[in-house]
Amino acid sequence: MPLRLCFRSAIVVLALSLATCGYIPRPVEGVPAGAPWEALPLRKWLAEDRAEPQALAFCAPPECSPGLAVSVVRLKGRDAQITHAVLRDPERLARALRSPAGRDKPVRTRISVEPLKDAPYPGFAISLAPADGRKAPAYGAALGRRSGESLDVVLVIGETEEAVQDTARRVAERELGS
């Protein structure tokens, strides 16, 4: 093969490799790398201008018990301001979830929120369950760090309160710094 053709082929391969880098998932710091945890190439999946996804990983039963999903997102501008206010006062979120705009009937969900104490950044824990109590609650936690106009947020959703809060604190320590 002539040298010029090899060079052109190498440039094409390099260009294609660089173009697909967005499809290579970034692992979430603070959760184990590799199986049973799976990282997703989130940046190419979400095209909204509201948040920049940084990383997403999940671990599903039966390999992982309890099941957990962890994400790291960056917000800017007004979205960062609103989210930062909710991180500091999670009862705002609970009120909005209980009486969403445009609904005539109240939501039939038990919602409880509480600030995360002893956390290095503002954040909260939340639980959501059907009001009839037929299903177990889902748990969530969020912690965020402000940096200028942007806000980096760690979100964790899972099946047990303790696992969610422990994971949120551990990931926030690694992703947001201590």
Question: What name fits each language-model region?
Answer:
Residues 40-44, 63-64, 118-121, 144-151:
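Short, solvent-exposed coil/turn segments at beta-strand boundaries
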Residues 1-21:
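Sec-dependent bacterial lipoprotein signal peptides
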Residues 18-36:
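Bacterial Sec signal peptide processing site at the extreme N-terminus
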Residues 147-178:
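Surface-exposed amphipathic alpha-helical segments
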Residues 124-158:
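A short, solvent-exposed beta-edge/loop patch
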Residues 53-138:
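Conserved polar/disulfide-associated segments of primarily extracytoplasmic proteins
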